Amino acid sequence: MDKKMKSIYTLIAVAALFVFLFLLERTLPATSMLFTVLKKGAIYALVAVSLNLLNGFTGLFSLGQAGFMLIGAYTYAIFTIPPQARTQVYQYFDGGVIQFALPVPVALVLAGLAAALFAFLVGLPVLRLKGDYLAIATLGFAEIIRAIFQWDKLGPITNGSNLLRKFPTFSSVLFPFAVSGLCIALIVLLINSSFGRAFKAIREDEIAAEAMGINLFKHKILSFVISSFFAGVSGALLAMYQTTVQASAFKAAMTYEILLIVVIGGIGSVTGSCLSSFLFIACSEWWLRFLDAQTVINGFQVPFLRSGFRKVVFSVIIMCVVLFYRQGIMGDREISVDGLIRFIKKPFAKKAKTKGGAAHE
């Protein structure tokens, strides 16, 4: 199939998805848990793909994604709170320093740029480390930035340890899908470009990549900065979804969740990260919720079912996946337009072959 036909089929698939989501919003009540899964899943898909760009395609083991999401969330919130609401939000800091509000699209881009700037400054010394040392350094950065943003000395900007609120949010599931979809498409274009091939060469063998003329540090920091940019955008989307921002929400556990999503989906697979994001959110927010509720059947209380047991079961499931199916759902494969068309045509091809054989007899 040529590129033109692939593009046409891709556009048709995207249009069909958005029509389906539009009809879904008109059919189901706004409180349906399905919308929670779709909204949060779309946001986590973006941050998982951004982490996969580092871990899966460049071979850099980073654990700082929650820190960059925090920067993006705060940047978006700070620059979009309406001036008339700032006295309520910054009530302990005389209305704060910033007294203007940016449009939502501009603030989303600014959130990514702020995270990218921090990534560049942190990456200059940190990316000279490798393996576990890099992971520890980036995890340390995420924890430090979380503490700094809660510092009361920065209260006129960050509101200290208090909530940021009253900034623009979204209610439609179409918004996070549109923003995340656009960002993921840009990441895919990057992966398929000459820069993406350089990232993969670094992942496979740094010595061989350097021998081929690839500037290792330049491409590593480029991958780190771009990944952080999209993590910042996803942080802004998460702030819009949650309607409030507080630094204490961006703990190391958030990075571990994102890393698990990447591992479950398949390290080096964009579509794997997207699929596992929705599965992860569906399990943690919806399907396994009953495990947290105490259940009594005919006077007998079912053992273990109490608050927190859901996370235990979910952890066991993840351990089984990591131990017995290490490649994840997709491995390093992708769901392509060609593959989907072949999958759809397969039953019809078998039926036609059976009819042809019967006619020949």
Q: Each predicted region: which residue ranges?
A:
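Transmembrane alpha-helices and adjacent helix-loop boundaries
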Residues: 1-361
